[in-house]
């Protein structure tokens, strides 16, 4: 038997951060069975190594258990893949005539400086996140790791939305303030003396446990429905997870959020988004956006946040002056609308920009596009390479 396994990175296992035990997926167990029964085994994947050496060593143990058995320790072990792995990159692939099979990929980092108002907002939100992160760490150390992780996750998302766009951070702060204010009123109704500072079980909210690792695990095999449900649950955690343990503490946090909202709203109304200015410059650059015959090139813009997607859709539509110049795909896009957006982007010469979250990756032929802009950095940097 000579089994050949495609998408072999799915045969994954990892060490538990709590117990140190190996958690094996069903696919990993299948790989172990194949490695023990097959004469030869070929594992194939186009997904880059995620950078976790201990997990990579577990994966390589499917090919040579003797060499890679045992937990990896930084500075002690080295994952030597000699004789077992061949790495091929697109840049090395040639036609039968010896010419490059794919055009050269040119990647650039576009730098920009924050305006004074943006800098002020950035520093104030960062101070808020830093303070609350300290509270979250104390909660975890006290034994409530799930709640501490949720608060840490919520604050991390806020920081990422701050970096995404003025619209994303403003809407996130507004939703969080509204949900926490509602929570405060609910607690006051069931508390005999709201001024006593009695410790309340704010962790009683039924929130799913979230961590950054779960966002990193989203990939091309995640279904539309799973992604939409995941994003909805994540938003719930971002809106509600708080380190406040008393009513006075919750009031203080709400007051801080109200101040941040005023600053964010002022930045949004000034309409001086330096990051957008750089994207607008790219869209105006004829050499980038049009080919030699003057026809418009296709452009994909990836963002991580739905609020930023809507914000950019309005900006780019106004820039081109046509509603049909832009199509969008995100986790909540219905399957039939997703298909229609892909067809318009691929075949309609007037539709030149696809705005998308990672949900667009499934079933989309990115070769049709000429230019790709990563407006935000994804949770898992490997996604940039996969795109």
Predicted segments, located by residue:
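Short, Asp-centered acidic motifs that coordinate Mg2+ and/or phosphate
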Residues: 2, 352-353, 371
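Conserved SF2 helicase motif VI
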Residues: 381-387
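A short beta-strand element within the Helicase C-terminal
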Residues: 55-58, 364-376
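AAA+ P-loop NTPase catalytic core and its hallmark functional loops
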Residues: 343, 347-348, 355, 364, ...
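Inter-lobe coupling linker of SF2 helicases/translocases
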Residues: 1-49, 54-206
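Catalytic acidic motif of RecA-like/P-loop NTPases
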Residues: 9-16, 48, 307, 360-361, ...
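Conserved Helicase C-terminal RecA-like lobe
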Residues: 102-113, 148, 160-161, 170-351
